[in-house]
């Protein structure tokens, strides 16, 4: 079955980020001028700025058809299926007496290539398709080389007991765990988690810390911060406005390096 082999960043810039499509991150241009267009993302292409300035600043120029088309294209590109495959999945979903959209997503999620991707055996769905088509994956101890194979509950997905197969999957898993460790360290330096570590503040959950930040009750280095994903540094000073007054905390004791 044919699949998309064209430029991927162009697709992502047009319809949004797709985790299963590629690991690449596009460069998004933002209009830095004044007026209603300030902060708007410039559409992709050579004449993207012209397209942006032709639209009304406070109104969406996307029609209902374009919105639905983008949703359909996101499904098609993310799961790596053709138009005909998607139509067949929709027809099958309509025959079941449940929510058609929910059943359609179940069909797409039960594909073998998607399950291999969800198990972090491959970084993307196209990479998972390659693992399957090269015979590295087993389903119930049987070789399956069809990426669109529909798995069932209680199926056992395993790796072929070959040196090359085990090397490929172990390499992908190690890369996944390395990224998770990096994200965990970065998450622990965000403002809500730092506020949760400070016992004198008396916060019991991350949700409570995020609520304080979004309300503007937290200042870092005498500057108001309303973004929960703010990365703190050891030299920062956090000021929290409470009913008892303003509490200042130096982050040297709560951050290492």
UniProtKB/Swiss-Prot annotation:
Q: S4 RNA-binding domain location, by residue?
A: 110-170, 189-255
Q: What's the domain of life for this entry? A: Eukaryota
Q: Does the keyword Repressor apply?
A: no
Cellular compartments per GO CC: chloroplast; small ribosomal subunit
Q: What is its main location?
A: plastid
Q: Which GO terms describe its biological process?
A: response to antibiotic; ribosomal small subunit biogenesis; translation
Cysteines engaged in disulfide bonds, as pairs: none
List where in the cell it is found: Plastid, Chloroplast
Asked if NAD is a keyword of the record, the answer is no
> According to the UniProt record, what happens if one changes residue 73 to P?
In CC-3008; suppresses streptomycin dependence of the S12 mutant P90L
What GO molecular functions are on record for this protein?
rRNA binding; structural constituent of ribosome
Which keywords annotate this record? Answer: Antibiotic resistance, Chloroplast, Plastid, Repeat, Ribonucleoprotein, Ribosomal protein, RNA-binding, rRNA-binding
Q: Which SUPFAM superfamilies match?
A: Alpha-L RNA-binding motif
Role: One of the primary rRNA binding proteins, it binds directly to 16S rRNA where it nucleates assembly of the body of the 30S subunit.
Outline the subunit composition: Part of the 30S ribosomal subunit. Contacts protein S5. The interaction surface between S4 and S5 is involved in control of translational fidelity.
NCBIfam families registered for this protein in UniProt: PRK05327.1 (NF003717)
> What family is this?
Belongs to the universal ribosomal protein uS4 family.
* PANTHER family the UniProt entry points to: 30S 40S RIBOSOMAL PROTEIN (PTHR11831), SMALL RIBOSOMAL SUBUNIT PROTEIN US4M (PTHR11831:SF4)
The name on file for this protein is Small ribosomal subunit protein uS4c
What species does this protein belong to?
Chlamydomonas reinhardtii
């Amino acid at each position: 079955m044919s699949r998309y082999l064209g430029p991927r960043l162009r697709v992502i810039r047009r319809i949004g980020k797709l985790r299963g499509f590629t690991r690449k991150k596009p460069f998004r241009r933002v209009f830095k001028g004044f007026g209603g267009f300030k902060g708007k993302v410039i559409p992709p292409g050579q004449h993207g700025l012209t397209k942006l300035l032709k639209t009304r600043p406070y109104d969406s120029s996307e029609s209902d058809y374009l919105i639905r088309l983008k949703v359909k294209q996101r499904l098609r590109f993310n799961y790596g299926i053709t138009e005909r495959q998607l139509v067949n999945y929709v027809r099958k979903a309509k025959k079941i007496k449940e929510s058609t959209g929910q059943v359609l997503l179940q069909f797409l999620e039960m594909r073998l290539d998607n399950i291999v991707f969800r198990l972090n055996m491959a970084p993307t769905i196209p990479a998972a398709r390659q693992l399957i088509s090269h015979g590295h994956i087993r389903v119930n101890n049987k070789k399956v080389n069809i990426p669109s194979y529909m798995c069932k509950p209680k199926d056992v997905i395993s790796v072929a007991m070959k040196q090359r197969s085990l090397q490929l999957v172990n390499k992908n898993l190690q890369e996944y765990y390395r990224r998770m460790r990096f994200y965990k360290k970065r998450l622990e330096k965000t403002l809500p988690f730092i506020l949760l570590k400070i016992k004198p503040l008396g916060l019991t959950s991350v949700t409570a810390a995020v609520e304080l930040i979004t309300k503007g009750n937290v200042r870092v280095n005498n500057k108001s911060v309303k973004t929960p994903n703010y990365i703190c540094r050891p030299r920062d000073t956090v000021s929290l406005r409470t009913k008892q007054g303003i509490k200042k905390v130096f982050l040297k004791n709560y951050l290492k390096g």
